[in-house]
Regions:
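Conserved donor sugar-nucleotide recognition element shared by glycan-biosynthetic enzymes
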Residues: 22-26, 51
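A glycine- and small-aliphatic-rich helix-loop capping segment at beta-alpha/alpha-beta transitions
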Residues: 10-14, 110
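Short pre-catalytic strand/loop immediately N-terminal to key active-site residues, enriched for Gly-Thr
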Residues: 13-23
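Positively charged, low-complexity intrinsically disordered leader regions
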Residues: 1-11
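Alpha-helix C-terminal capping segments
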Residues: 30-39
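Conserved N-terminal subdomain of the carbohydrate kinase-like
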Residues: 39-123
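Short, flexible micro-motifs
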Residues: 2, 26-28, 55, 80
Length: 123
């Protein structure tokens, strides 16, 4: 997923700037495992355009295996994250409808290849 968040503790629509980070729970787990020297393979679907390329390259940069990532669909899921301040709680707004992974079907994946040699499958 693509995370968009305002700098510091600004509110989402208070700031003219947004930081761009690729992440999401499952991606964060894969990156953490790879960082600690474990083999990690990421299984998902991302768009076949420059944004999808950037996601795959970011995962590879951290040592995550990306050979089972499908390149299909037209959009990457997005989430907007505001960091809370004082009495204001943090807030997350998800925009995942019609993303590549949301529209992927189980039969789109080569599960024999994806699960080959896998001891643990995290969802």
């Amino acid at each position: 997923m693509l995370r968009l968040s305002p700098p510091d503790r600004e509110k989402l629509f208070q700031s003219p700037r947004l930081r761009v980070i690729f992440g999401g729970g499952e991606a964060n787990v894969a990156v953490s495992l790879a960082t600690f020297g474990h083999a990690a393979r990421f299984i998902t679907a991302v768009p076949k355009h420059e944004v999808g390329d950037a996601v795959v390259n970011e995962l590879r940069r951290w040592g995550v295996e990306t050979g089972c990532i499908l390149r299909q669909g037209k959009r990457l899921g997005i989430y907007f994250a505001e960091t809370g301040a004082n009495q204001r709680a943090s807030k997350v707004i998800y925009d995942r409808d019609h993303s590549s992974i949301a529209e992927a079907k189980p039969g789109d994946f080569d599960w024999d290849k994806a699960l080959d040699g896998i001891d643990w499958f995290h969802t």
